[in-house]
Amino acid sequence: MDLGEIVEDVKREINLNEMKGKKISIDAYNTIYQFLAAIRQPDGTPLIDSKGRITSHLNGLFYRTISIIESGIIPIFVFDGKPPEKKSEEIERRKRAKEEAEKKLEKAKLEGEYREIRKYAQAAVRLSNEMVEESKKLLDAMGIPVVQAPGEGEAEAAYINSIDLSWAAASQDYDSLLFGAKRLVRNITISGKRKLPNKDVYVEIKPELIELESLLKKLGINREQLIDIAILIGTDYNPDGVKGIGVKTALRIIKKYNNIENAIEKGEIQLSKINFDIREIRKLFITPEVKKPTERLELAECNEREIIELLVKNHDFNEDRVNNGIERLKKAIKEAKSVEKQTGLDQWF
């Protein structure tokens, strides 16, 4: 679901330093997929250990998360639970797309097409249960808060933000706004110079901030109407949306008729084009399956032995680099906790 066109006027670049001392609830799966897609060898294949196991996600979680904490930010990684039944069509679509990419990847390898290899290697990326569990284990060893969502991780991260347990939710997807996040930060874990897909061009990617209240005020709508706009153009629960309706048309329709049902009643949208349950999908965004976290939401001291065991002994990471990372992490945690404490005190004066 891409609301990009209608958030353009309210999103702004935000420096990591502006988030110093603040907690950010991060959609873990979304972030790990970013690492798997972005952290690659020159030929486009992911980083692997001596046993052929993918390690791109661990590399990203370790080194890039350290950089985030060095900026004074306290990350909270939120992992997916069981997805809603309504998401099964989208999950199946993604599975087919990956299978197709895998076929094209093998063909590109046989033909020695390196640009195509890189392209399809990224498209074919998969996140296994083992990779998820290792990610949780690494984050825990690093002293970073981990929350297990009952349902969608993105919904839980947004909920944590909506009840002020974090300053913002972080994800590449705009769904966080539909789930009620007050603030959404994009590009927090992938900022810096990045190569454009299939091009020898590098661009500077910077974190972006979108505030829900500012967006709704700018558009002259409420959150439920924003959800209806998303439903019309397609969400994870109705991937195809309504044929022929883009985001600007959807905005015009909802502003004129207030909701999808009224637009159907007035003949603006043909009922025959609606092959999904509007109310059920709307409900999944308004009242998603979430819980108030019982997990620790503070940074803790890292466990050096467990980090070395997982990265160096199990996955062949360079020991000197990891030890250097651990020293950076220890210092960053100490400073981030100090900044958070001072930020909290400043609010009283």
UniProtKB/Swiss-Prot annotation:
One of its GO terms (biological process) is DNA replication, removal of RNA primer. The keyword Nuclease applies. Residues 1-98 are annotated as: N-domain. Residues 116-258 are annotated as: I-domain. Pfam families: XPG_I, XPG_N. SMART domains: 53EXOc, HhH2, XPGI, XPGN. It comes from the Archaea. Signal peptide: none annotated. One of its GO terms (molecular function) is 5'-3' exonuclease activity. Keywords: DNA damage, DNA repair, DNA replication, Endonuclease, Exonuclease, Hydrolase, Magnesium, Metal-binding, Nuclease. Binds 2 magnesium ions per subunit. They probably participate in the reaction catalyzed by the enzyme. May bind an additional third magnesium ion after substrate binding. Mg(2+) 1 binds at D27, D80, E152, E154. SUPFAM superfamilies: 5' to 3' exonuclease, C-terminal subdomain, PIN domain-like. Residues 341-349 are annotated as: Interaction with PCNA. Interacts with PCNA. PCNA stimulates the nuclease activity without altering cleavage specificity. Belongs to the XPG/RAD2 endonuclease family. FEN1 subfamily. This is Flap endonuclease 1. It comes from Sulfolobus acidocaldarius (strain ATCC 33909 / DSM 639 / JCM 8929 / NBRC 15157 / NCIMB 11770). The lineage of its organism: Archaea, Thermoproteota, Thermoprotei, Sulfolobales, Sulfolobaceae. The gene is fen.
